[in-house]
Curated annotation (Swiss-Prot):
It catalyses: an N-acyl-L-alpha-aminoacyl-tRNA + H2O = an N-acyl-L-amino acid + a tRNA + H(+). This is Peptidyl-tRNA hydrolase. HAMAP family: Pept_tRNA_hydro_bact. The active site is at 35 (proton acceptor). The lineage of its organism: Bacteria, Pseudomonadati, Pseudomonadota, Betaproteobacteria, Burkholderiales. It is an enzyme of class 3 (hydrolase). Its main location: cytoplasm. TRNA binds at residues 30, 81, 83, 129.
Length: 210
């Protein structure tokens, strides 16, 4: 008796980035504050991708829809304030059936100095309430993060509490360093949209110096 074996080929989900979430707080009072570094980068990426942000209340944020290499790419700036960022990211990921591995979050990072940036996948939230809420909304920590260094008041010699520090604008030299990081991030995001995270990481981290 001959046995017939059937091989089922399951489609492999692309792990290239399809949703970019810039974190920050909405409104003019917060526009220039350190906590809004993710918004700053998201605005530049929308320009690079020739996309325009528009309010989509069902997704709790300003959403921009773009195309890259024939694929759809979404950008979002949540309007729920930092601590509820997961509402927007979770709603978009569910509606468009995106895996956590296809999500890139842009956020400020206290543990990196201005002028430094790191790309990483997974890990904890290190007390960052925006990341904490996104992790809960996605049910996984396996999304990608672009950590934009803003420094810590202690390492920058400032007598400020962290909560106050992140809600103030960077000093001029800090802003210049952050702007340089944003420029470097813009250069490597296309590689992430292509799924080449090794290239993006190598190019991005080489600019951090010793």
């Amino acid at each position: 008796m001959r046995r017939v074996f059937c091989v089922l080929y399951m489609p492999i989900m692309s792990t290239a980035i399809r949703l970019i979430a810039g974190l920050g707080n909405p409104g003019p009072d917060y526009e220039t504050t350190r906590h809004n570094a993710g918004f700053w980068l998201a605005d530049h990426l929308a320009d690079d991708l020739r996309a325009t942000f528009a309010l989509e209340k069902s997704f709790f944020g300003m959403v921009a829809k773009a195309r890259h290499a024939g694929e759809n790419v979404l950008l979002v700036k949540p309007i729920t304030y930092m601590n509820r960022s997961g509402q927007a990211v979770g709603a978009l990921a569910r509606f468009y059936k995106l895996a956590p591995e296809q999500v890139l979050v842009l956020h400020d990072e206290l543990d990196l100095l201005p002028g430094q940036v790191k790309l990483k996948q997974g890990g904890g939230h290190a007390g960052h309430n925006g990341l904490k809420d996104i992790q809960a909304a996605l049910g996984s920590p396996n999304f990608w993060r672009l950590r934009i260094g803003i420094g810590h008041p202690r390492t920058l010699g400032l007598a400020q509490q962290v909560a106050d520090f992140v809600l103030h604008p960077p000093r001029r030299d800090e802003q210049t360093a952050i702007d340089d990081v944003i420029h470097r991030c813009r250069a490597v995001v296309p590689a992430m949209l292509d799924g080449d995270f090794a290239l993006a990481t190598r190019q991005l981290h080489s600019g951090n110096g010793a």
